[in-house]
Structures are given as structure tokens and as C-alpha cells.
Amino acid sequence: MRYLLLTAALAMNMQTMVAQSSYQVKNSVTLRNEDCDLTKMSVILPVPVSNIYQDVVGLKESSGMVLDLDASNRYLRDIKTDGQPSSGESYTLSEEFSVTLYPVYIDMAQFTTLYPYDTESAIYKRYTADKGGYIDTSNPTIRSVSDRLWSESGGEILDYARLCYEYVAANFKYLYTDTGISPIATILSDGGGDCGNLASIFVNLMRAKKIPAKHIVTVRPDGSHHVWADFYLERCGWIPVDVNARLVDPRGNYFGYCRGDGIIMSEDICHEAEFLPGEKFEGVILQTFWYWYWYRNASGTVEAEHALRGRQTDRVSIPVIGETRYDGASLSWNLFPGATGYRAKVYEKATGRLVDAIDMSADASSMPLDGLDPETEYGIVFTPLRMVGNIETSMGTYDLALKTAAIPTANEEIEAGELRVWAAGGRLFIRTPEAERAYIVTFDGRVYKTLSLPAGEYSERMPQGSYIIHIGKQSYKLNF
């Protein structure tokens, strides 16, 4: 008897960001028997689980059983001992599930206090450990660079993490697509690698200073692949860092950033899985599939093809500005799945002055934008918020713009018995059919004068300038 392990080649590349959204996904591997007299096959697919970046529900498997790899990883294993595909025939193992993916943007300014690590915690012990040649904190280059960056940071965890992120982006290149994870010595010698290998450099530098860090391994709904890194802050949680995105966009900020377009298939690297009961194999990266086959003839080949496709089932709509008034407008949106609140910042476009910052609860679907000046252009930055542990994250940022309307005036002829307000010769004229109270307001919001008007016509001279006249529910803009 012979058995042969083959793993899928990994294509890790970047692509444009998609909106936070939900998918119905089918993940499968098809084995085609080219010329074997097969006696047995064992096939493994990673099983995605819910975590801070995604919610996974409704898992269904074509065959096999789901097993726990560790606290944060699972896999589907099917051991096929009869009914093997004959030469030229195929066998497919598949899983289907629904997933909602969450973009994550973290404002580092919220971390005003950093706590020492609990060195006895499971997170600390697992994610500061070496892993053979793949995470090797004794590597001379890793030791030298980590010591230098640690000194530059003054021993501050966040400063050190950012320096590591910038160091990798500045000193290494994206190379060798489809190679999977290499030993750290190879990555350093080559001067880079694909996104998983670039993440490896960051993870090695973090673990060298006993800061918990790990790879995040994904497959996108279109079947492409990506890997980024996370590091951990005690009492706060995990922070995403996408070094490869920084290489693609050198002016972008991908520190505390997750695009939200990849289905996380596993976390960390170097996993030990049982391909048969009681028999274990350590694979470097669990992203697509592993498989083994046994055959009677002297030689033989079984080819494998992986396919993951997601059908989008829901996408959050873009926020919409309602009808604008001279003094404001309204903003509305469909609820964002997973959001724990919403924030809008309103600023004056011409000056950049922040006018207002409004926070709304998770069940809100609209907010008023009041107290704005007439005939003025404003920008609105709308952000759905999501609390992840003790970290406030934003699930994307939406930039909108509006221009407020002009204050209605009444300088035209109006039939007798109707309210009329007009300016002539530097004077204010008000004709009202009944007693009214009028407010003369300057454009900066200051009440210049309050008038108690009898029925009939009223007039007074006005200082030069522009004013808003409020009478009942009517408002008028006049220039003197």
C-alpha cells in the first residue's frame, strides 16, 4: 500500500474592496482519478467559523464529519473506503454555508491605556510561540530588526507594531504568487513573497517581542485568496494589519484595517490534523484542501481541483440624504447587519469646520441634520459602528454632500389678507392679517430683535446686512 499527500497551490492576491455583505457559499474539492486502482481516499476541507470578522450559519456537508482542529479552527474530513472512482471518474466533497463579512477599521486613538500581557493565558502562550522554521524568533535577522524597532518605539506596543508594519512594506516585495507559506529564513533571503509570506515577517517580528500575533487565512467569494496578520492587545482584542495592501497602495493606511471581503478559513499556521483516526499530519496552511489516496498499482495519479463560489444575498445600501431645507436635511439608511451604532460628522466644505457629530443607536435608520446655514455646502462622513470586544470599529466610511436651500422670500405681490414680508429702501416691511410675533435673526444664529406685531402693516429701518425673518411657520431671507 502507498499513500500520497498533495496540497493545493495557493494564489494570494489583492483586489478592490467590496461593501460589507452576505453570501451563500459552496466550497468544494473534486478529485479525478487519472489512472489509479484506488483503495482509499481521505479529504479535508477547512470549515469557516464565526469570529470577529464574520458570522457563519447553516453549514451543510455533502459527506464526512466536522472535527475540531483547535479552539478557533475546524475541518471537514471524509474518509472514503468503498465506492472509489474508477480511472477517468471523479469524486467531490463539498460544504455549503451562509456568511456575513464585516469590514473593520480601527481608530488607534481609542487605546489610551495599554495593559501588560497575561503570560499565563492561552492566547499568550499559543500566539507568542515559535513554529519550526516558519515562525522562528531566534532567526538572526528577526532578532536584529526586532531589537532595533523595539528601541525606536521606546518599548510601546502600538508604536512597535506600526514600525514593524512599515518596515515590512518598505523593505520587502510581493513575489512568487501561488507558493504558500515558506520558512521565515527563505522569505528573508528572497526579499519577500506573497501576502501570506509578508504576513509571516510581521508575525515573526511581533512574536520576537512576545506580542501575540497570527496569520488570518481567507478565500474570497470569487475564489481568490488572501492572508493578513492580527496582533493582540490585552483586555482589548485583535488588531488587523494588512502589509500587502500597504505595498499595493503605499499612501494608504492598512494598520488596524480589514477589507471585509475574505471568508476566514483558518487562523494561524502549522496545523496538526487527523487524516485517519489516530494518524496525524501537520500542514503549514489550511486554506483550500488537503487530500491523500491509496492505490494498488505501482504508480498512479489523482488530480484535484478546488472551487469556492459565493452568491451575494444581501448588500447594505448607501445612506441617502433626504430633501434639504434652508436650515438642514435628513439622512436615512437601511440597517447594517452587525452594527452597534451609527455616527455622522458634518463639516462645512469651504472651511473644513466641524459643524456637528451625531451618534445614533443600533436600531436607528435615520438621523436629523439640523442647525445648518442656508445656501451652504456641507460634507457628511457617515460611519456604521461595531463593538468588537472592547474595541470600537467602523464598518466602512461613506462620504456624502449636500447644499442647503435658500430661505424663501416674499417680495412678490400678495393678495390682501395674506402675510407679506419685503424690503425696500433699507426698511423692513411686514403686513400681517392678524397679530403675530416675529423674530429677526442674523445669519450666525443670533436673535437681533423680537417683534410683537399688531394686525396690519409694520415698518422699521434695518442696519445693512442679511437677516432671516421668522413669523409663525414661515421664514424669509432679506438683504438690506
Go through each PLM region and give its residues.
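Intrinsically disordered, low-complexity N-terminal segments that are enriched in acidic
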Residues: 20-104
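Active-site rim recognition segments
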Residues: 223-313
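Secondary-structure boundary elements
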Residues: 91, 97-190, 201, 283-289
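Conserved aromatic anchor
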Residues: 327-339
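Residue-level detector of functionally pivotal "anchor" positions at catalytic/ligand-binding pockets or at interdomain
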Residues: 311-324, 399-427
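Active-site neighborhood of thiol-dependent amide/isopeptide-bond enzymes
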Residues: 152-235, 249-252, 257-263
